[in-house]
Amino acid sequence: MPSKKALVRRPSPRLAEGLVTHVEREKVDHGLALEQWDAYVEALGAHGWETLEVDPADDCPDSVFVEDAVVVFRNVALITRPGAESRRAETAGVEEAVARLGCSVNWVWEPGTLDGGDVLKIGDTIYVGRGGRTNAAGVQQLRAAFEPLGARVVAVPVSKVLHLKSAVTALPDGTVIGHIPLTDVPSLFPRFLPVPEESGAHVVLLGGSRLLMAASAPKTAELLADLGHEPVLVDIGEFEKLEGCVTCLSVRLRELYD
């Protein structure tokens, strides 16, 4: 039976110092961010996910975006080497967490860089964004780690947003959804559904037809509901100021086994 565990990490007191690349910096309300994070974690739990907190990394402003520190396929965890040097201290606590869960652990080594937010898994196909945070050596090391396990790794150019999953994610049937102005090459995906809002391109598959989505994408939620999906909306506005989205606030572990 597939596992339903999700790694999460409490926001750092220095959250407001987090990196911004493609947006203008806005003031972050730390108290409100904590409330929004709690509600996000509660939403996962309410839909059957066991949330596991990674030890906080208070000196790492971006550490709440825990997805960037690891990529898991089958029972193998690839600890990333983030493209932003200031984020590399985030990986140690995540490595400890996945090791406790029994994952086999591999690492991305210099000169490779890889952010987990650049990795979109659809079945046995792994799309990896080649952009500002993930380089060619990182793509090669991801391929070396997971192709022997049966994965098909497809590199995708990313130039308009921070990460691949800032531009696209996927529905339960494998259809990729994305906001056209931010998607470099939509034709790379076998099935592509345009959505009307930037944050509407980000969904977390909760199980069945349920999709965790940002409250900032009501038009997309309406579109997806009309297609038979069940949007579950959460307000993550303080994290969106830092280019965060619903996917990067957790690491969903669906394929763990004893």
Curated annotation (Swiss-Prot):
Name of the molecule in the record: N(G),N(G)-dimethylarginine dimethylaminohydrolase
Amino acids binding substrate: 19, 62, 67-68, 87, 133
Superkingdom of source: Bacteria
Species, as recorded: Streptomyces coelicolor (strain ATCC BAA-471 / A3(2) / M145)
EC number: 3.5.3.18
Residue stretches in coiled coil: none
Active site location: 163, 248
Record's function text: Hydrolyzes N(G),N(G)-dimethyl-L-arginine (ADMA) and N(G)-monomethyl-L-arginine (MMA).
Alphabetical GO biological process terms: arginine metabolic process; citrulline metabolic process; positive regulation of nitric oxide biosynthetic process
An example Gene Ontology molecular-function term: dimethylargininase activity
PANTHER family: DIMETHYLARGININASE, DIMETHYLARGININE DIMETHYLAMINOHYDROLASE
Key word Hydrolase present: yes
